[in-house]
């Protein structure tokens, strides 16, 4: 997983509420688990027209917002079914951060596991950011995870994130990798636990 410390890039506004995972990654792109080529599926029904040509009216196809690093999203972004393909696709498309008011819980967790930062801001801050994101002349921002700040052309906006989430994103580790650093302590606890309560330990299976 890629690290996230300080990243600069353009932010694209997608402020519609309740954009669900079926919109982010349509079902026809869920067939594999190898994570290959999922960037093509992101917002497929909006990015492309019936004949497969790019939709010129979709924000991520417009010159000032192509290859956007951040998305400014509406409330309850990522709702719907739990499909990690949606997050994999966003990451492959180059999205490193989502800024909004609220995110669906499972989707938010999937972003955390895959190196995409989610930031929740209050409505006044989102409104100011939306005004800047709407113009290609002012839609460049810098997000510092170390300082928990978003720097725009006009101001610096502070945000709050849990220390555990910040630390894991900063070093590029998911929950499994983060837990493995405590393996010696876990093993020591297990030995001590079963030495005091041996009746809790399951006998070895005869099948190995």
Curated annotation (Swiss-Prot):
Keywords, A to Z?
Answer: Amino-acid biosynthesis, Branched-chain amino acid biosynthesis, Leucine biosynthesis, Lyase
Reaction catalyzed: (2R,3S)-3-isopropylmalate = (2S)-2-isopropylmalate
Keyword Lyase in the entry? The reply is yes
A Gene Ontology biological process in which this protein takes part is:
L-leucine biosynthetic process
Recorded GO molecular functions are: 3-isopropylmalate dehydratase activity
Matching entries from Pfam families are given as: Aconitase_C
Say if the entry is tagged with keyword Lipoprotein. no
This protein's assembly is summarised as: Heterodimer of LeuC and LeuD.
Q: What does this protein do?
A: Catalyzes the isomerization between 2-isopropylmalate and 3-isopropylmalate, via the formation of 2-isopropylmaleate.
Protein name (Swiss-Prot/TrEMBL) = 3-isopropylmalate dehydratase small subunit 2
Taxonomic path: Bacteria, Pseudomonadati, Pseudomonadota, Gammaproteobacteria, Enterobacterales
């Amino acid at each position: 997983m890629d690290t996230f410390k300080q990243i600069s890039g353009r932010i694209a506004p997608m402020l519609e509420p309740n954009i669900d995972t079926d919109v982010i990654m349509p079902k026809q792109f869920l067939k594999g688990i190898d994570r290959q080529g999922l960037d093509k599926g992101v917002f497929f029904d909006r990015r492309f027209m019936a004949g497969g040509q790019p939709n010129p009216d979709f924000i991520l196809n417009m010159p000032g917002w192509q290859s956007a690093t951040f998305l400014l999203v509406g409330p309850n972004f990522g709702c719907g079914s739990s499909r990690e393909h949606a997050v994999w696709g966003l990451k492959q498309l180059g999205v490193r951060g989502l800024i909004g008011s609220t995110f669906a819980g499972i989707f938010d967790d999937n972003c955390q596991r895959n190196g995409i930062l989610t930031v929740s801001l209050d409505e006044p801050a989102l409104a100011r950011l939306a005004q800047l994101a709407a113009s290609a002349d002012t839609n460049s921002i810098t997000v510092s995870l170390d300082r928990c700040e978003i720097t725009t052309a006009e101001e610096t906006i502070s945000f709050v994130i849990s220390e555990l989430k910040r630390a894991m994103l900063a070093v590029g580790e998911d929950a499994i990798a983060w837990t493995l650093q405590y393996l010696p302590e876990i093993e020591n606890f297990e030995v001590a636990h079963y030495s005091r309560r041996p009746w809790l330990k399951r006998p070895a299976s005869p099948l190995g």
